[in-house]
Amino acid sequence: MTTSNRRYHITTFGCQMNKADSERMAGILEDMGFEFSEDPNNADVILYNTCTIRDNAEQKVYSYLGRQAKRKHEQPDLTLVVAGCVAQQEGEALLRRVPELDLVMGPQHANRLKDLLESVFAGNQVVATEAVHIMEDITQARRDSTVTAWVNVIYGCNERCTYCVVPNVRGVEQSRTPEAVRAEMEELGRQGYKEITLLGQNIDAYGRDLPGATPEGRHLHTFTDLLYYVHDVPGIERIRFATSHPRYFTERLIKACAELPKVCEHFHIPFQSGDNQLLKAMARGYTQEKYRRIIDTIRRYMPDASISADAIVGFPGETEEQFENTLKLVDDIGFDQLNTAAYSPRPGTPAALWENQLSEETKSDRLQRLNHLVNVKAAERSQRYMGRIEEVLVEEQNPKDQTQVMGRTRGNRLTFFKGDINELKGQLVKVKINEVRAFSLTGEPIEIRQAVQV
């Protein structure tokens, strides 16, 4: 099949891992000769990279698919692809539900997109959901940004949280070698990228599957070791990482983050619940006391560190008192940002089968109460920025105000200020903050520090 002058479109649902996978699959499609189309109705290949963490995201996928399936009856050459976690979970059942589909592929197969599409173009309907070793030879991604980039360091998850479908759809943990991670970062540095976010479902579990151990029995390749190994990559000014699991978040890692100047003082560590009984029912493997100690240790080493997290309300059996324990933890810690969600039963998870499910009304009420507190605490946390000078990495123009540029502080606060994006994109700018909101800042530039060129 000739792919020149043909177009593709990717719609991505869900987490940062999916966004990184979509960038790699876009790179594969462009290597094959396809051009990107913003409008799916003008595309010859439409790929939905899906999320199954919550039911609403899954239902949205089926809605999109229904529209394009109708179009395929009028345009038989249209190629429809479902990738990601819904594809992995449903497999061949997706073909029965949407027979117009050409390719169903789980997240472990993202790097095999070219081979799978060539099979489709040869006339086959393809399902690729079997467990595979993720290919280390990662195709050059089509990055959405020219300033910041994702770099996967570990795929999959070995945890068995009772509410979560991720281990079922993303497979067991597979760490990339330190050499492969550094090589990708070096290439990004040569291309002019300034900030790297290292990605993993449980990134602080990195290296447990790699060979070797220290004489003390510690894994030879921990995430802390990886940070030291990649920290001096030329051209890279900032390093972030996500997502961390409290079970593996050590003082050694915290100390490394405090010592390494490129590592940003921002930590995303989901706690899910502030009640020990619920944490045990969730099989999270820690207590709320341990979580508090982690945050206390971070703030001891880095008093101004930004903390973000995830929380679930309405987990099966959650009492009002248990929910209030979550509110207390949020009130005590004071998160800079908190991603909240009402519990959504997911197929194949233990908690979905439990009889003590809460009503949608109760879940909605608790979510609203939690979100109110989150906004109050975030606004309180923002006050510390007023009048301060913050280093901002400029990423893009403010879409709502063409006279402003936008970027993020080291603590991950979205920040706006007057400026020309053509002059400032990719630059580190000292900004004096004169306006604060719960989740963003506004200021005036006072100094531009030219980022190091390589």
Swiss-Prot record:
Primary location class: cytoplasm
Gene3D superfamilies membership: Methylthiotransferase, N-terminal domain (3.40.50.12160), tm_1862 like domain (3.80.30.20)
GO molecular function: 4 iron, 4 sulfur cluster binding; metal ion binding; methylthiotransferase activity
Location of the Radical SAM core domain: 143-380
Keyword annotations from UniProtKB, A to Z: 4Fe-4S, Cytoplasm, Iron, Iron-sulfur, Metal-binding, S-adenosyl-L-methionine, Transferase, tRNA processing
InterPro entries associated with the record: Elp3/MiaA/NifB-like_rSAM, Methylthiotransferase, Methylthiotransferase_CS, Methylthiotransferase_N, Methylthiotransferase_N_sf, MiaB_methiolase, rSAM, rSAM_horseshoe
Residue ranges annotated for the TRAM domain, each copy included: 383-447
Enzyme class: transferase
PROSITE patterns: MTTASE_N, MTTASE_RADICAL, RADICAL_SAM, TRAM
Subcellular location: Cytoplasm
Complex formation: Monomer.
Name of the protein this chain belongs to: tRNA-2-methylthio-N(6)-dimethylallyladenosine synthase
